[in-house]
Amino acid sequence: MKILILTIATNKYIQFVERLYDNIEDKFLNGHEIQGLLFTEHDVETSDNIKVSQIDNEPWAMPTLKRFNYFVKEKDYISQFDYCYYFDVDMGIVSEVGDEVLSDLVATMHPYQSFYPKEQRTYDRNPKSLAYVPPGEEGELYYAGGFNGGSTKRFMEMAEVLADRVTKDLENDVIALWHDESQMNRYLIDNPPTLSLTPSYCFAEEQMYNSEYPYDAKIIALKKDHNELRS
């Protein structure tokens, strides 16, 4: 099968690209044809199996908020693939990830908020946002934005809805609390994923040596200085 990896690397986040692609080549869905689609404002050289899509250089948090808008812009290209998976560029793969992640719509449980009572999870509570989740409408699970995907058809159906919602929010001077993650969680309450991966697939690096954490790491969110990277 043909698998496309979606990644965004703006500003200083470009430093993580090479490591992530090396990890994917070594440990992600081996045995399938893997290609990449990198969204960046940088002028970069890549291997033949990586396509670069140029985006505007915008301040944080526009590059993450508008990720689904970027995907929709490349819909014709993305639609050539059987499955597509989005990785935050500052992720690492520490254990082999195989066909267990193949499903129509795949989301990953948040490495922290999954353990909170659902009424304490930080859904968007602003009624002016299309990501709004009223008290009492919380989902059974809360999902992280760092790794998700699925069949191209189902994933792009979600992307088109969320791109439209983000655009409408921006037209009303509204930004969802956790940007794309808030928008995605609202969508997944109404359209549950066909596969909910455990926090093993979006594992906080600072938990690597915590013997009491109930999951083992497969894909990790690297510990970093967010303020420095976004400056």
Predicted regions and their residues:
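Catalytic core and acceptor-binding pocket of nucleotide-sugar-dependent glycosyltransferases
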Residues: 137-225
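GT-A fold catalytic core of metal-dependent nucleotide-sugar glycosyltransferases
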Residues: 68-118
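PAPS-dependent sulfotransferase catalytic domain
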Residues: 100-157, 161-162, 181
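Active-site regions of enzymes building and remodeling cell-envelope glycoconjugates
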Residues: 47-58, 101-109, 212-220
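Conserved glycosyltransferase catalytic-site signature
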Residues: 64, 68, 89-91, 177-182
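N-terminal anchoring/stem segment of glycosyltransferases
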Residues: 1-66, 73-80, 224
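Short, polar loop motifs at secondary-structure junctions
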Residues: 36-45, 89-97, 201-202
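A structural signal for short, well-ordered beta-strand segments and their strand-loop junctions
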Residues: 37-38, 84-88, 108, 149, ...
